[in-house]
């Protein structure tokens, strides 16, 4: 991307988005893990413009702090300016220009905050065309099979751009035109300022339309150019939730395809969803029904899925994660997780470790080679290397007031159904008997067993639950046991 360096970008994000039927501002609705506005600002920041401006209006008090956070993460300044009244896109651009230095004299790119697939390369091509043609304005256009709702591009007989007419103001014949305004422009700032001062609200919406600038500059004898793109999805806008879902699916298709081209096997792209900030290593296999969300990072040669959702999870090389729901966790190299495993935030599983069926973990570190095979809750615990936690074990971490930690050493073997009542420490190499309740520390190498000998209360069910199916079954079994077997020498 090479173009003239004196460039400012103005992103319009002041609209109310009433067709979304939502309390959330339109530009904050998300696709592939980012809000629409975040997609736009990430793309424009890649151009490294001198100035990046966002024009806000509706719900600006909710959007502005998020813009500040994004600016910090991108490591650049993003200026925010307000459009106090919804007077149209022309007025919004005028508000955006007010955030630029008074002596700025370069190119102004105008785009919208609700075109989430627009990329930096497309805008760079627009700027290159604009500079090469020495135009006052260059507009990005595309052709749609159904152009309803878009402004139509009017051209002269020699194919020069003459004007843009909005859907509501177009004549029946103009509405048949399929080349549309993509809502992305490159302007020379002096030409733009001059045309903005002459905009009129004499139209169906009684607003100041930015596209009317094209006709004004044309009448001034200025050069008006267009850059047509075939990939119309890049400039598709979102006005309702149907369009949000459609563009979300298209963006996901592109993300999945990019991973496939980079060496990832995706068995069923139609049921696989990958956020834009997720990363996947080579020769990893993604099974159907998998969602990789947020900043999830998958290593090389992993097996992920089926039916797995990972949000902000790091997975090391050669790991297997099957039918698992995890968030804000780390899975070590060559580890095995699943099926039906729930990793809550703060889980760290070491290299070669195992979390098996119906295991839930939270805020815990499980060491290298340690196995928690099934039916276990591990919360607020630190488990050393090469230990084994028996089936049905529970880390009892909550005393009704505070969460307490348990520390389990390396090479520990806990029997099935062990209860670790935190805070408690179990030393290296210790064992616990099945069903043991660990309330006190266990020294290294010790066997911990709780509870006395088993005591059977005879006939308790018949006495305490008479008439129940259990009591009847017990009565029959007792009767059969009390009947002597027949004498083989004297059959009945």
From Swiss-Prot:
UniProt binding sites for Mg(2+): 114, 239
Protein name (Swiss-Prot/TrEMBL): Bifunctional protein GlmU
Self-association and partners: Homotrimer.
Function of the molecule: Catalyzes the last two sequential reactions in the de novo biosynthetic pathway for UDP-N-acetylglucosamine (UDP-GlcNAc). The C-terminal domain catalyzes the transfer of acetyl group from acetyl coenzyme A to glucosamine-1-phosphate (GlcN-1-P) to produce N-acetylglucosamine-1-phosphate (GlcNAc-1-P), which is converted into UDP-GlcNAc by the transfer of uridine 5-monophosphate (from uridine 5-triphosphate), a reaction catalyzed by the N-terminal domain.
Pfam families registered for this protein in UniProt: Hexapep, NTP_transf_3
Stretches the record annotates as Pyrophosphorylase: 1-241
PANTHER family membership: BIFUNCTIONAL PROTEIN GLMU, NUCLEOTIDYL TRANSFERASE
Pathway named in the protein's UniProt entry: Nucleotide-sugar biosynthesis; UDP-N-acetyl-alpha-D-glucosamine biosynthesis; N-acetyl-alpha-D-glucosamine 1-phosphate from alpha-D-glucosamine 6-phosphate (route II): step 2/2; Nucleotide-sugar biosynthesis; UDP-N-acetyl-alpha-D-glucosamine biosynthesis; UDP-N-acetyl-alpha-D-glucosamine from N-acetyl-alpha-D-glucosamine 1-phosphate: step 1/1; Bacterial outer membrane biogenesis; LPS lipid A biosynthesis
Binding-site positions, UDP-N-acetyl-alpha-D-glucosamine: 12-15, 26, 83, 88-89, 151, 166, 181, 239, 344, 362, 377, 388
Region of interest called Disordered, as start-end residue ranges on this chain: 443-492
InterPro entries referenced in this protein's UniProt entry, alphabetically: Bifunctional_GlmU, GlmU-like, GlmU_C_LbH, Hexapep, MobA-like_NTP_Trfase, Nucleotide-diphossugar_trans, Trimer_LpxA-like_sf
Enzyme Commission number(s): 2.7.7.23, 2.3.1.157
Originating species: Mycobacterium ulcerans (strain Agy99)
Catalytic activity reported: alpha-D-glucosamine 1-phosphate + acetyl-CoA = N-acetyl-alpha-D-glucosamine 1-phosphate + CoA + H(+); N-acetyl-alpha-D-glucosamine 1-phosphate + UTP + H(+) = UDP-N-acetyl-alpha-D-glucosamine + diphosphate
UniProt region (Linker), positions on chain: 242-262
GO molecular function: glucosamine-1-phosphate N-acetyltransferase activity; magnesium ion binding; UDP-N-acetylglucosamine diphosphorylase activity
Known cofactor(s): Mg(2+)
The encoding gene: glmU
Record flagged with keyword Acetylation: no
Enzyme class: transferase
Family statement: In the N-terminal section; belongs to the N-acetylglucosamine-1-phosphate uridyltransferase family. In the C-terminal section; belongs to the transferase hexapeptide repeat family.
Residue sites binding acetyl-CoA per the record: 391, 397-398, 434
């Amino acid at each position: 991307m090479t173009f003239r360096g004196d460039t400012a970008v103005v992103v319009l994000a002041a609209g109310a988005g009433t067709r979304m039927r939502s309390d959330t501002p339109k530009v904050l609705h998300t696709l592939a893990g980012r809000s629409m506005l975040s997609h736009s600002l990430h793309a424009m920041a890649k151009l490294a413009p001198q100035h990046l401006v966002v024009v806000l209006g509706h719900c600006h008090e909710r959007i502005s702090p998020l813009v500040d956070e994004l600016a910090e993460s991108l490591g650049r300044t993003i200026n925010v300016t307000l459009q106090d009244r919804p007077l149209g896109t022309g007025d919004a651009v005028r508000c955006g220009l007010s955030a630029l230095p008074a002596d700025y004299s370069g190119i102004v790119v105008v785009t919208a905050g609700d075109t989430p697939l627009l990329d930096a390369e497309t805008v760079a091509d627009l700027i290159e065309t604009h500079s090469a043609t020495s135009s006052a304005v260059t507009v990005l256009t595309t052709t749609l099979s159904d152009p309803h709702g878009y402004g139509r591009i009017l051209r002269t007989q020699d194919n020069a751009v003459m004007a843009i007419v909005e859907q509501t103001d177009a004549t029946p014949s103009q509405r048949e035109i399929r080349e549309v305004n993509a809502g992305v422009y490159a302007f020379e700032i002096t030409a733009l300022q001059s045309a903005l001062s002459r905009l009129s609200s004499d139209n169906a919406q009684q607003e100041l339309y930015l596209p009317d600038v094209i006709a004004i500059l044309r009448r001034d004898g200025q050069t008006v150019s267009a850059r047509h793109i075939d990939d119309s999805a890049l400039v598709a806008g979102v006005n309702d939730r149907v369009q949000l879902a459609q563009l979300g699916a298209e963006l996901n298709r592109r993300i999945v395809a990019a991973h496939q081209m980079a060496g990832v096997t995706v068995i069923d792209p139609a049921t696989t969803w990958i956020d834009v900030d997720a990363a996947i290593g080579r020769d990893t296999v993604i099974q159907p029904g998998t969602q990789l969300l947020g900043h999830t990072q998958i290593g090389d040669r992993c097996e992920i899925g089926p039916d797995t959702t990972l949000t902000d999870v790091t997975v090391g090389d050669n790991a297997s994660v099957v039918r698992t729901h995890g968030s804000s966790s780390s899975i070590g190299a060559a580890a095995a997780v699943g099926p039906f495993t729930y990793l809550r935030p703060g889980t760290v599983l070491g290299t070669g470790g195992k979390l098996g069926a119906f295991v839930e973990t939270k805020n815990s570190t499980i060491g290298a080679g340690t196995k928690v095979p099934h039916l276990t809750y591990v919360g607020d615990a630190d488990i050393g290397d090469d230990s084994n936690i028996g089936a049905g074990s529970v880390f009892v971490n909550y005393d009704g007031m505070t969460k307490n930690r348990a520390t389990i050493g390396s090479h520990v073997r806990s029997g099935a159904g062990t209860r670790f009542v935190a805070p408690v420490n179990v030393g290296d190499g210790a064992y616990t008997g099945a069903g043991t309740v660990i309330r006190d520390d266990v020294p290294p190498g010790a066997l911990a067993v709780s509870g006395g000998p088993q005591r059977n209360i005879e006939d308790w069910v018949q006495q305490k639950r008479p008439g129940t199916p259990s009591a009847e079954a017990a009565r029959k079994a007792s009767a059969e046991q009390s009947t002597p077997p027949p004498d083989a020498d004297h059959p009945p």
